[in-house]
Amino acid sequence: MVLLTEEDYSDLNEDYFNDLADTLFNKCYLVANGSKWRLVEIEFYLNNENHADPYVHCDPDQLLSHTFYFHRFKNRTYKSGTFKGMDITLGTYPNDPKFKPKKTDTKTYFGILIRSVQRIKTGEIIEGPCNTVNKLLEQYEFTKIDELTGGESLDLFENDQNFYLKFTKSLKSEKIYSGPRIGLSDKFMEWRDLPYRYVIFKSSIKKRKTTLKELN
């Protein structure tokens, strides 16, 4: 199971982001210790030689393909408190400790930040990257990210923690809206205002709804 193949990286653009958003919103859900969660709000962060988005963390974990990346400080410890966040990574390197990249290999850092989720069973929406991480940890009665990950990158589709993304045909297809990402500095205006934030259930989202436009 994959969201991106190796050949896809040469064609990544805004339309590709739109397609990926549709897949993540309408054709997948997240499982956390048996509880099912629909992605409701996400943001795209891609940095490579053809798309040098300066707002990307460019953490080594974002080079990995099809993993969960919990945000880290430069010393490799996990961010805590209100700085918690989690990405789906779609970088160009396989999630294999034996893999040794060559100097000629193209580096693509690609993280999809999960900003909000909905519990499918109850309809409850959890808004904000930190709140989302805390709620998912709560399903395991954990308070720290290390308790879930053991400090390692978790595979997106299969791991020992029963924490994974699952493809499905059972979800109702929802309208998708996009707009500028949230909380970025004004340093790189040409990148800050690109429509790389995606949302479903727009009426249930509190932050910056007026900047969101329905995708055609």
From Swiss-Prot:
Protein name as catalogued: Uncharacterized protein L759
SUPFAM superfamilies named in the record: FMT C-terminal domain-like
InterPro entries: Formyl_transferase-like_C_sf
Molecular-function annotations in GO: catalytic activity
